[in-house]
From Swiss-Prot:
The gene coding this protein: GCG
CC terms in the record's Gene Ontology section: endoplasmic reticulum lumen; extracellular region; extracellular space; plasma membrane; secretory granule lumen
Post-translational modification: Proglucagon is post-translationally processed in a tissue-specific manner in pancreatic A cells and intestinal L cells. In pancreatic A cells, the major bioactive hormone is glucagon cleaved by PCSK2/PC2. In the intestinal L cells PCSK1/PC1 liberates GLP-1, GLP-2, glicentin and oxyntomodulin. GLP-1 is further N-terminally truncated by post-translational processing in the intestinal L cells resulting in GLP-1(7-37) GLP-1-(7-36)amide. The C-terminal amidation is neither important for the metabolism of GLP-1 nor for its effects on the endocrine pancreas.
Residue span of region Disordered: 26-59
Entry-linked Pfam families: Hormone_2 (PF00123)
Chain positions found as Arginine amide: R127
Similarity remark: Belongs to the glucagon family.
Gene3D superfamilies the UniProt entry points to: 6.10.250.590
Transmembrane annotation, as ranges: none
UniProt protein name: Pro-glucagon
UniProt keyword terms in alphabetical order: Amidation, Cleavage on pair of basic residues, Hormone, Pharmaceutical, Phosphoprotein, Secreted, Signal
Additional free-text comment from the UniProt record: In the glucagon antagonist, His-53 and Phe-58 are missing. This antagonist has been successfully utilized to reduce glucose concentration in vivo.
Signal peptide range: 1-20
Prodomain positions: 84-89, 131-145
Amino acid sequence: MKSIYFVAGLFVMLVQGSWQRSLQDTEEKSRSFSASQADPLSDPDQMNEDKRHSQGTFTSDYSKYLDSRRAQDFVQWLMNTKRNRNNIAKRHDEFERHAEGTFTSDVSSYLEGQAAKEFIAWLVKGRGRRDFPEEVAIVEELGRRHADGSFSDEMNTILDNLAARDFINWLIQTKITDRK
């Protein structure tokens, strides 16, 4: 959306510049016509008009310079914000944390991945029924609370793990014909 405004601003500046130039050309033609009819040294109005014209030309040139300078500054600002926005986003992502009271650890993620790999390997090998000794630790985790006294989302994770283990035990213990 900003680029549309930028392009529209440039277009307005170009139209304004061409409009001013056509007015200056018209003024010069009318001035040359009146100058040919009267002597410039004897006419004080002509001298004032020349002075006013030179001041107007300077003002016009200066305003064109300021407009182009503003356009350059705006483009530079856009480029800097784009560069800074990317750096800010990267820095923000690096320091972004989870909700208050929870903490993620690379070690725990690694251990969970290893446990999943071991379980899949155990299923593929087709070993017999296995009891899960971690159930004792899970029961202890159920009673754990955060410092503020609220249950965490770990409760849902633990319950999901228990349900998955019960389902896998049921799959292992029942025969294929009993499942239908």
